[in-house]
């Protein structure tokens, strides 16, 4: 064993702010924060649904609060942003070929968004 101290380069907590790629990455990962709140709100909604009509009405009034509506809008925008980043990565991760020719990346991404729109429409019709 050696008593020599290895060189450890000091890294500031804000190192990622200097690199556009890492800023984008941190922004994408931060989209989970409003989604956590949205999930907590829905969990409490399920609990109030079980407790009865009065608790359910209280939860509906809570969800009508402008701050909660704003959090839900931010969560929706965050999830759409997150989906866009994943959809744009898919053609690079899993290139699709038809008859030996690569399918255009834009077509793959647009097909994914079309699937999201179609499924959302079906859910809205059923509900």
Curated annotation (Swiss-Prot):
Domain of life of the organism encoding this protein: Bacteria
Cross-referenced Pfam families: Fumarate_red_C
CC terms in the record's Gene Ontology section: fumarate reductase complex; plasma membrane
InterPro entries: Fumarate_red_C, SQR/QFR_C/D
An example Gene Ontology molecular-function term: succinate dehydrogenase activity
Gene3D superfamilies to which the protein is assigned, alphabetical: Fumarate reductase/succinate dehydrogenase, transmembrane subunit
Intracellular or extracellular location(s): Cell inner membrane
Record's keyword terms, sorted: Cell inner membrane, Cell membrane, Membrane, Transmembrane, Transmembrane helix
Membrane association type: Multi-pass membrane protein
TM region(s), chain numbering: 30-50, 67-87, 107-127
NCBIfam families listed in its UniProt record: PRK04987.1 (NF003445)
Subunit structure of this chain's protein: Part of an enzyme complex containing four subunits: a flavoprotein (FrdA), an iron-sulfur protein (FrdB), and two hydrophobic anchor proteins (FrdC and FrdD).
Function: Anchors the catalytic components of the fumarate reductase complex to the cell membrane, binds quinones.
Homology family: Belongs to the FrdC family.
Protein name: Fumarate reductase subunit C
Species, as recorded: Vibrio campbellii (strain ATCC BAA-1116)
Top-level taxonomy: Bacteria, Pseudomonadati, Pseudomonadota, Gammaproteobacteria, Vibrionales
């Amino acid at each position: 064993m050696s008593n020599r101290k290895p060189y450890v380069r000091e890294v500031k907590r804000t190192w990622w702010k200097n690199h556009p790629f890492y800023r984008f990455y941190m922004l994408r990962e931060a989209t989970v924060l409003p989604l956590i709140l949205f999930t907590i709100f829905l969990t409490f909604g399920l609990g109030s649904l079980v407790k009865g009509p009065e608790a359910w009405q209280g939860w509906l009034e809570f969800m009508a609060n402008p701050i909660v509506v704003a959090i839900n809008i931010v969560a929706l925008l965050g999830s759409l942003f997150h989906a866009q980043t994943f959809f744009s990565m898919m053609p690079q991760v899993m290139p699709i070929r038809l008859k030996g020719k690569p399918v255009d990346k834009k077509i793959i991404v647009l097909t994914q968004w079309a699937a999201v729109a179609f499924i959302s429409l079906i859910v809205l019709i059923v509900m």
